[in-house]
């Protein structure tokens, strides 16, 4: 039933977002001189929820927000400020920035560990996540289903019990 599948999917997505249980290292990225914007390429049917860490040539980069970046380094896009990256910015679920803008092209220079979540259109998730967190997924799904109003199975008290143990 698509209603049940949809609620299982929503529970798994929420579990991954809130707990960080679904993580992976992405393939190394080659940086290109003068380019600061890079694609996040997670496994199929997943999205990057959060960047856990970024290494540039083995050195850890500091996460920074776009607002703080513009305050600290307002001219960071100008060629005279290019250099060795010190910061990363998660711009969207598909893009991140390196700052300063790299001043050299270096193969496989950048490594990332990310927190993943399934897409809302996905039909599967990592077996490890589904197996290791089966009980939480079942409890979260039952909470979601039982709290639906005006259904023959609606049970707000039961939903509250499953919410507490989820």
Where are the predicted features?
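Glycine-enriched, solvent-exposed interface loops adjoining structured elements
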Residues: 1-166
């Amino acid at each position: 039933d698509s209603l049940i599948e949809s609620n299982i999917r929503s529970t798994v997505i929420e579990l991954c977002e809130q707990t960080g249980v679904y993580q992976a290292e992405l393939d190394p990225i080659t940086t290109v001189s003068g380019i600061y914007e890079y694609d996040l390429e997670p496994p199929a049917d997943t999205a990057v929820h959060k960047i856990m860490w970024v290494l540039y040539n083995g050195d850890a980069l500091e996460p920074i927000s776009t607002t703080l970046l513009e305050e600290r380094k307002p001219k960071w896009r100008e060629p005279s400020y290019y250099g060795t990256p010190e910061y990363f910015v998660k711009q969207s679920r598909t893009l991140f920035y390196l700052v300063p803008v790299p001043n050299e092209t270096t193969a496989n220079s950048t490594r990332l560990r990310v927190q993943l979540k399934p897409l809302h259109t996905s039909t599967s998730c990592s077996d490890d996540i589904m197996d290791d967190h089966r009980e939480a997924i079942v409890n979260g799904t039952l909470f979601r289903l039982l709290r639906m109003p005006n259904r023959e199975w609606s049970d707000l008290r039961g939903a509250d019990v499953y919410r507490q143990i989820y």
